[in-house]
């Protein structure tokens, strides 16, 4: 009986370790192809945290537009808080809608910045 119990515990331990390794590898592969300055898809950005997440986020519809958040709390905040839906373009200093903005990774920590057009995006990253 003792040997059977030890065998089961060993199997469970191997299974848990293999699941952990697989998730870590998947995360690295997903984020590997975007770097600072790259334009990223809206659906991979948490618009509440202003962060590139590397995978599809939760879709939130508001006033006929689509926003994205990473959790249930973000889904609640997007319709209620204007700063979850709007951002300032760093070049024009105009308030723009995140749902229609060009979104790019701004630093090595996967924070994002929003632009009202491609010309502003190019001006921002050419001056860095």
Spell out what each predicted region is:
Residues 46, 89-92:
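Short cysteine-rich clusters marking metal-coordination/redox-active sites
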Residues 20-22:
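Bacterial signal peptide processing site
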Residues 15-18:
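C-terminal motif of bacterial Sec signal peptides marking the signal peptidase cleavage site
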Residues 35-73:
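Post-signal-peptide N-terminal segment of Sec-exported extracytoplasmic proteins
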Residues 24-33, 69-77:
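Short Cys/His-rich Zn2+-coordinating modules
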Residues 24, 53-54, 97:
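Short functional micro-motifs and their immediate structural scaffolds
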Residues 1-7:
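Positively charged n-region of N-terminal signal peptides that target proteins for export
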Residues 73-87, 119-128:
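Short metal-binding segments enriched for Cys and/or His
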């Amino acid at each position: 009986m003792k040997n059977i119990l030890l065998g089961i515990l060993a199997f469970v331990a191997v299974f848990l370790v293999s699941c952990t390794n697989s998730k870590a590898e998947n995360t690295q592969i997903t984020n590997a192809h975007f770097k600072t300055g790259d334009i990223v898809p809206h659906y991979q950005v948490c618009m509440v945290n202003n962060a590139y997440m590397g995978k599809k986020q939760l879709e939130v519809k508001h006033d006929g537009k689509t926003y994205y958040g990473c959790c249930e709390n973000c889904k609640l905040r997007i319709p209620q808080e204007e700063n979850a839906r709007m951002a300032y373009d760093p070049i024009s200093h105009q308030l723009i809608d995140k749902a229609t903005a060009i979104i790019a990774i701004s630093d090595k920590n996967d924070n994002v910045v929003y632009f009202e057009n491609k010309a502003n995006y190019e001006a921002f990253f050419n001056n860095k």
